[in-house]
């Protein structure tokens, strides 16, 4: 389905501001090489949820080959190719206990391990700074919000205070981070 959507829309041009993509595709998980090449050369953006393979690894391994599972949600590859990408939780679409918790998805993108430790494609890991950017500064323009996600003059000054420094903890602990305060 993703390949078909890319095939139909990859030549579209943005009709909004310069930073808002012409097309945003959701649930991008396993696109073909052709779809990735077209997306990289288009005004398209992809929103993805590596939390699905993290939370539902048993189903993935039951229905797909191990190599297909490891090739799914290749966020690092997409970024290297120049594909505009954001992360989202897509709550409540996963069976995970707290589907709207962004820290589980951040952990999944950074560690590329499922909840049970299964390797879900180490070559597609991204660092925590990149993962946070894909949830904030990159995600806003995907829906037309071009003044959010960065603390700088002219932008909305919304921010959160966490119970620990997410940039300085072991990646296996990212899902344990808690929000202490939200400032809007």
Language-model segments: which ranges?
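His/Asp/Glu-enriched, well-ordered alpha-helical/loop segment
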Residues: 6-23, 27-28, 33-37, 41-44, ...
């Amino acid at each position: 389905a993703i390949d078909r959507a890319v095939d139909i829309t990859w030549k579209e041009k943005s009709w909004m501001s310069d930073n808002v993509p012409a097309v945003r595709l959701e649930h991008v998980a396993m696109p073909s090489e052709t779809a990735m090449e077209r997306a990289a050369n288009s005004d398209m953006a992809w929103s993805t949820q590596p939390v699905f393979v993290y939370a539902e690894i048993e189903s993935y391994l039951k229905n797909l080959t191990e190599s297909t599972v490891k090739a799914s949600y290749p966020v690092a590859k997409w970024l290297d190719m120049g594909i505009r990408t954001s992360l989202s939780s897509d709550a409540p679409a996963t069976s995970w206990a707290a589907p709207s918790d962004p820290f589980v998805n951040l952990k999944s993108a950074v560690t590329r391990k499922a909840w049970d430790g299964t390797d879900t494609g180490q070559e597609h890991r991204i660092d925590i700074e990149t993962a946070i950017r894909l949830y904030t500064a990159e995600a806003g323009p995907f829906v037309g919000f071009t003044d959010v996600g960065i603390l700088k003059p002219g932008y909305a000054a919304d921010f959160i205070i966490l119970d620990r420094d997410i940039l300085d903890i072991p990646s296996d602990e990212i899902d344990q981070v808690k929000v202490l305060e939200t400032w809007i």
